[in-house]
């Protein structure tokens, strides 16, 4: 069965979801029937075809009135600001991928369901009242048919959660800290301009900028046993894509750096293949652009202090890796069925 999806919000993640769908060869499993985006149709087509981070899309893209064509596939374009007014029932939408980065509450999810969608997947963290939060590769098996409003967590949560799980299972984590070194984002300024966060009033291309992060809460949402045992900070750096995460954890069992690397490399080749990758090459951030993994461990940067403090550096393409996980989670949601169809 082919899953019929609609995308609400066609920004960085929405466009990368479409690109990833076509590049990964999963069109027999997923069909995009509609895109809802307030921008004009010409702009939608142009930014899908040409991308500063990921290059020119290999597929032919054209726009005819309110239809977007990718190859021979026609996708209906909508410009509807009110979720409840979207024609999901008419279009027989199975799963809405809400990639606005704005909506994430149960109320917004239920509006999609009332419009006729069978299930909703948010591309960002949602509230505690959602049916589930999924980090694919770790907890997608906990999905149930009655889980209709789901969050795919965040790109950084998807990056770090598999590594935390591996280290905890092997050595027993007592506590940890996380520093996210994240590329600049759309909520920053090109030149100095007003913003409620005074640090984000400053030009994104000229400074390393500390910002707030809810990553510690995201870790606890997946692993409640770590409540009050993880802290996180984040800085934005003057690059346009790819993120590095510095993870430090204290563990119960004594360990050596080489043993940590052996554990993570084995996982990348085995149980976490396709989700986690491992490298010891002398690479930099641009080398991980367009990498589909959630996390790439840089084994050259692993350190252990006093046998119980582990430090690792983990890379991710915060756009491309996450877009691929959106597709994975969509398929997982569809595979368990639609118990409460609208």
Swiss-Prot record:
Q: Which GO terms describe its cellular component?
A: cytoplasm
Q: Which residues bind NAD(+)?
A: 12-13, 318
Please indicate which superkingdom the organism of origin belongs to.
Answer: Bacteria
Instruction: Quote the record's binding site residues for substrate.
Output: 154-156, 200, 213-214, 236
Q: Which GO terms describe its biological process?
A: pyridoxal phosphate biosynthetic process; pyridoxine biosynthetic process
Keywords assigned by UniProt, alphabetized: Cytoplasm, NAD, Oxidoreductase, Pyridoxine biosynthesis
EC number, UniProt record:
1.2.1.72
Checking Gene3D superfamilies in the record gives: Dihydrodipicolinate Reductase, domain 2, NAD(P)-binding Rossmann-like Domain
Q: Give the InterPro entries listed for this entry.
A: E4P_DH_bac, GlycerAld/Erythrose_P_DH, GlycerAld_3-P_DH_AS, GlycerAld_3-P_DH_cat, GlycerAld_3-P_DH_NAD(P)-bd, NAD(P)-bd_dom_sf
Active site, per annotation: 155 (nucleophile)
User: Which residues are annotated as site, described as Activates thiol group during catalysis?
Assistant: 182
Keyword Amino-acid biosynthesis appears in the UniProt entry: no
| Location of this chain's protein in the cell | Cytoplasm
The Swiss-Prot or TrEMBL record annotates one GO molecular function as:
erythrose-4-phosphate dehydrogenase activity
Q: Which reaction does it catalyse?
A: D-erythrose 4-phosphate + NAD(+) + H2O = 4-phospho-D-erythronate + NADH + 2 H(+)
Its pathway?
Cofactor biosynthesis; pyridoxine 5'-phosphate biosynthesis; pyridoxine 5'-phosphate from D-erythrose 4-phosphate: step 1/5
Pfam families, sorted: Gp_dh_C (PF02800), Gp_dh_N (PF00044)
Q: Its function?
A: Catalyzes the NAD-dependent conversion of D-erythrose 4-phosphate to 4-phosphoerythronate.
Q: Which HAMAP family match?
A: E4P_dehydrog
Description of how the protein assembles with itself and partners? Homotetramer.
Hey, which family's this protein in?
Belongs to the glyceraldehyde-3-phosphate dehydrogenase family. Epd subfamily.
Report what the protein is called. D-erythrose-4-phosphate dehydrogenase
Protein's organism: Klebsiella pneumoniae (strain 342)
The top of its lineage is:
Bacteria, Pseudomonadati, Pseudomonadota, Gammaproteobacteria, Enterobacterales
